[in-house]
């Protein structure tokens, strides 16, 4: 008998005696969900690279049994794994040889970021299990997720805090460790679902919330994983988009849902924490791209600055130059009731002035911008920023904004100029991941593939400071 071949009786004995074993079902997802061996996990790799990553995360000394339809593919993969030193086997003649009862899945084996967000919005009973290392988890995470590193999940007793009456979602950075986590949980008869693409793809989920203000429609688009905020501003069927993020096509979808046609796209400044979708959205919709004339771009655009007007529908946006976060930062005023402030002023803090290595000079400009421009508006003016920080809650209507009156209560804005500059430049916050490359991409000096964006944007946004 082939030493890596395992009969159904042998596998049945292993299960009955509760001998540690990983049973990996490599059939198509639907076949697995329709009926599988109790304690097995679905193991589908999309490429040889992913297969190698998955194997590197498996416990090397544990017995592994591969299951397919007829034993053919499972045998090939078991032989390959054995060559890498694994105690790998395959079920002879595959699942068709298994005479005992098969169990059906009660939940999908994988879930997309969009579908997970829908579940969380609907308050569905889910348990988020983050299997990254503690230092990764502490950097950024989905709120409410519990951290048990994958390296611990195979240790007896490590799964005691995982509820068996909730839908368990496993999470990692790219969806590989989370898949292996489903293997570990299946050993203990815990069904689980792996987040496809992990935190990298979670950072690409967009959620739209609409605010109606008379003739004006404001659609705030939140990049859930990073707290980036974009705005679609509509009037009489026409819309402008401010600070769009990827995926760009979602903005057309959000606008159309409210009966709006995008006629212009704007970036408030050169972003450092996320890749701007402004150029691609403008090209996709065949509209103008508006960028600051005080910042260097290698992108064809309509340059704008202080005092310029951008019409849409029956309304118009007025440009004000609001330097400090960057030299060319702009804010946009609508009807003297709404200000779209970019990274100048946030609900919880202000834009950081140090990302261009001129912190003291930019902090001085930021003080002037805040006190002599933004805070000069009426107290009831609503200010819509381009980010919100961790732990910041939206208003009752689900929109993130502040008012001039509320902004005046921020501790940093209660300081005089010298105190402000001294305090701001002394606050040390880690810079956004990949910020230098992202700035170059947003300038248009280096190209980027859409496939690269999730990895470039990994991590929290770090463009604000607060006391």
For the regions a language model picked out, list residue spans one by one.
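Histidine-centered divalent metal-coordination motifs
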Residues: 141, 266-274, 325, 329, ...
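Generic beta-sheet signal
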Residues: 91, 195, 290-293, 342, ...
